[in-house]
């Protein structure tokens, strides 16, 4: 039996379960299973295309009395073709309808990159100049309305986060980014901590959709060594590293056994002598998002510009 999920406190005072469930490419049955196992933070996004399915699960489990809405922490994300201020509230309204809830606990700008309204997926001709300041003001209005209990960003570099902090009336509660032992984001961590922004790590075990990437994390020699010494799986060690580093983690799995395993990270810790070994792991970013950069059509001409060199 997994220990109760612990929390990180956001700058709004809200408590964010420190192990959440990533829902990209997840089916309803797996999400229902995860909630029944004990997951309470569900990380959604409109672009994932499954918010209606998730909404059906939420309605069923809340209606059956298995879980109360206030016990769940639901995150969703604004897609890049809805960045115009007039489109932001419409996008959240669609998400709320699909999820069959009255509010989200956290709403994020998914990428600091914009697409033309008629485009869903990023192609060179559909890339357009982002105006994050205007988009953020619309996000702040959603926060004021209570339909988004907290607002934040995703995939923002240190520079982009700093630029936003310089103009924001409401400080972002979260910056959700790729983070795992092979991409530790130390500089971004320090910035977020100094500004009261919680860092949340997606792909904490590497990307499930890219097997070779997952292996680079879970078969890393240092991660493997620590797991063997502690009698834990490499996945548990990677997740526990994240929690001890100070960020929430968003693993995803459709396997009941793995879902339980990923929650079993609370009643033990990585000793300091082993924890320091993680600083010796060579760093490599896996999610590069090359589709948001283009030398002719893109606002970001290169991925170095997209990530401001943090790549």
Curated annotation (Swiss-Prot):
Keywords: Acetylation, Detoxification, NADP, Oxidoreductase, Stress response. The modification N-acetylalanine is found at residue 2. NADP(+) binds at residues 23-24, 43, 110, 154-155, 176, 203-208, 252-254, 258-262. One of its GO terms (molecular function) is aldo-keto reductase (NADPH) activity. The active site is at 48 (proton donor). GO terms for biological process: response to cold; response to salt stress; response to toxic substance; response to water deprivation. Its EC number is 1.1.1.-. GO terms for cellular component: cytosol; endoplasmic reticulum. Induction: By drought, salt and cold stresses. Pfam families: Aldo_ket_red. The keyword Oxidoreductase applies. Oxidoreductase acting on a broad range of substrates: reduces ketosteroids, aromatic aldehydes, ketones, sugars and other aliphatic aldehydes, and oxidizes hydroxysteroids. May function as detoxifiying enzyme by reducing a range of toxic aldehydes and ketones produced during stress. PANTHER family: ALDO/KETO REDUCTASE. Belongs to the aldo/keto reductase family. This is Aldo-keto reductase family 4 member C8.
């Amino acid at each position: 039996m997994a220990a109760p999920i612990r929390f990180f406190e956001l700058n709004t005072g809200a408590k964010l379960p420190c192990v959440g469930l990533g829902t990209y490419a997840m089916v309803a049955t797996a999400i229902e299973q995860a909630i029944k196992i004990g997951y309470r933070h569900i990380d959604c996004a409109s672009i994932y295309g499954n918010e209606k399915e998730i909404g059906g699960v939420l309605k069923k489990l809340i209606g059956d009395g298995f879980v109360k809405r206030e016990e769940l922490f639901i995150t969703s994300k604004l897609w890049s073709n809805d960045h115009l201020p007039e489109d932001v509230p419409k996008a959240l309204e669609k998400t709320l309808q699909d999820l069959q809830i009255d509010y989200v606990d956290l709403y994020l700008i998914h990428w600091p990159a914009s697409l033309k309204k008629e485009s869903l997926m990023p192609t060179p001709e559909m890339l357009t100049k982002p105006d994050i300041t205007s988009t953020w003001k619309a996000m702040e209005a959603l926060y004021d309305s209570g339909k988004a209990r907290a607002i934040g960003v995703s995939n923002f570099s240190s520079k982009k986060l700093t630029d936003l902090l310089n103009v924001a009336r409401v400080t972002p509660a979260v910056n959700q980014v790729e983070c795992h032992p092979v991409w530790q984001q130390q500089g971004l961590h320090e910035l977020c901590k100094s500004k009261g922004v919680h860092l949340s790590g997606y792909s904490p075990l590497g990307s499930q959709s890219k097997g070779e990437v997952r292996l680079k994390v879970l078969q890393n020699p240092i991660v493997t060594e620590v797991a063997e010494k502690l009698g834990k799986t490499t996945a548990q060690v990677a997740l526990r590293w994240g929690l001890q580093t100070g960020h929430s983690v968003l693993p995803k799995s459709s396997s009941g056994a793995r879902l339980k395993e990923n929650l079993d990270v609370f009643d033990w810790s990585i000793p300091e002598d082993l924890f320091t070994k993680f600083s010796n792991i060579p760093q490599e970013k896996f999610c590069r998002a090359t589709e948001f950069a283009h030398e002719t059509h893109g606002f970001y001409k290169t991925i170095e510009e997209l990530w401001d060199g943090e790549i």
